[in-house]
Amino acid sequence: MEQYKQEFIEFMVDSEVLKFGEFTLKSGRKSPFFMNAGGYVTGSQLKKLGEYYAHAIHDKYGDDFDVLFGPACKGIPLSVVTAIAFSELYGKEIRYCSDRKEEKDHGADKGSFLGSKLKDGDRVVMIEDVTTSGKSMEETVPKVKGAADVEIVGLMVSLDRMEVGKGGVKCALDEVHDLYGFETNAIVTMKEVIEHLYNKEYKGKVIIDDTLKAAIDAYYEQYGAK
């Protein structure tokens, strides 16, 4: 596993963004783990988060793209910090763009978007925290495609939970790929998280022991993507 992936897994744990225990998700599912991407709140956390996204995007998509698009609301800071990190790490100036929840009807920046305007010929990488249902893409892709003649290169999320999406068979990222045709990737998958943390001591404790691993296995037996 790449070094940046290992570091990102530990970063999620240290930031208390990825937690293990007993949780009830919005869907009503009982889950042995929970991710709250809103837990990144400090300057140093956001700086590191942008760097991990930049590493993963460069790893999967290279630098042949023009715009990072982050859907409102959580995608706005993600697109900003990742554009900064990409410039610093790879020397490539990438523009950021996000949509507004409500269209602004006045001022120099009026319209449906924040940041850079999308232009014909732009190659766009979309960025989100986590995709569990693909619903946000149903709203976002038509907006992006309708703004200009652009090509969506791919989507990057922080964690692939590897759970079935709306179709009940494939994970949400695969469903998005099948529906729209562009690549979908995550900085890490839950499989990689488990591989890195299972029965390994980290900062004086074993985060995923045999008991928790059994609970995770049972969860994926019921809800895991095929």
Where are each of the predicted segments found?
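PRPP-associated nucleotide enzymes
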Residues: M1-I127, T132-K226
